[in-house]
């Protein structure tokens, strides 16, 4: 499996590409799916590569409410769900869903990848804890108390969107808080 991943790794850029097209060309878009390769029980990336990948992902995708689905400097980035239309129809919602929208559930794989790449020492856990505080405040005090919205805008102030109670978002936050009690 690791050998197959080699063709996805961009050595100079320090991250995994999301897509290799049929003609062999690479889609260089920075997306969060690469977190999975470092968040598994048996990670596919080395710790060194995971740390490099996290540096890119955290600088481009990490927000206070989760991870963007596309980096803001990409030409197809949509920072506001539904392209900012007050009454966005299904088409306008769909075209923005994977183009910059923030998904809170991705905080779970991010935490696992960060612990793998940087260990679970007090400094690393403090960094993670500080980045989880906004989503913990959201689940505790905002919207549907005890729940997390499905998505948030990619642009600040990261307005909550989608359904007001998304099980996979809640489950991933509860999972990492259970696995790493020092984060609470």
Regions found by a protein language model. Give the residues of each.
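Structural helix-adjacent loops and short alpha-helical linkers that scaffold large soluble proteins
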Residues: 41-54, 114-129, 178-184
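Hydrophobic alpha-helical segments
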Residues: 113, 117-120, 134-145, 151-154, ...
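Catalytic cores of carbohydrate-active enzymes
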Residues: 1-73, 78-82, 130, 136-170
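C-terminal substrate/ligand-recognition segments
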Residues: 72, 76-124, 174-178
């Amino acid at each position: 499996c690791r050998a197959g991943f080699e063709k996805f790794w961009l050595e100079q850029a320090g991250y995994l590409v999301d897509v290799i097209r049929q003609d062999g060309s690479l889609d260089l878009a920075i997306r969060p799916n690469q977190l999975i390769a470092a968040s598994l029980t048996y990670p596919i990336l080395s710790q060194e590569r995971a740390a490099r990948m996290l540096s890119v992902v955290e600088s481009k995708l990490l927000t206070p409410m989760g991870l963007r689905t596309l980096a803001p400097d990409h030409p197809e980035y949509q920072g506001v769900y539904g392209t900012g239309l007050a009454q966005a129809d299904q088409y306008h919602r769909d075209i923005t869903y994977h183009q910059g929208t923030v998904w809170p559930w991705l905080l779970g794989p991010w935490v696992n990848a960060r612990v793998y790449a940087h260990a679970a020492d007090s400094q690393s856990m403090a960094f993670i804890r500080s980045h989880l505080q906004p989503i913990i405040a959201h689940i505790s005090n905002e919207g549907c108390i005890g729940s997390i919205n499905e998505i948030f805008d990619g642009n600040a102030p990261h307005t909550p969107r989608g359904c007001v109670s998304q099980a996979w978002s809640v489950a991933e936050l509860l999972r990492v808080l259970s696995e790493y009690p020092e984060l609470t």
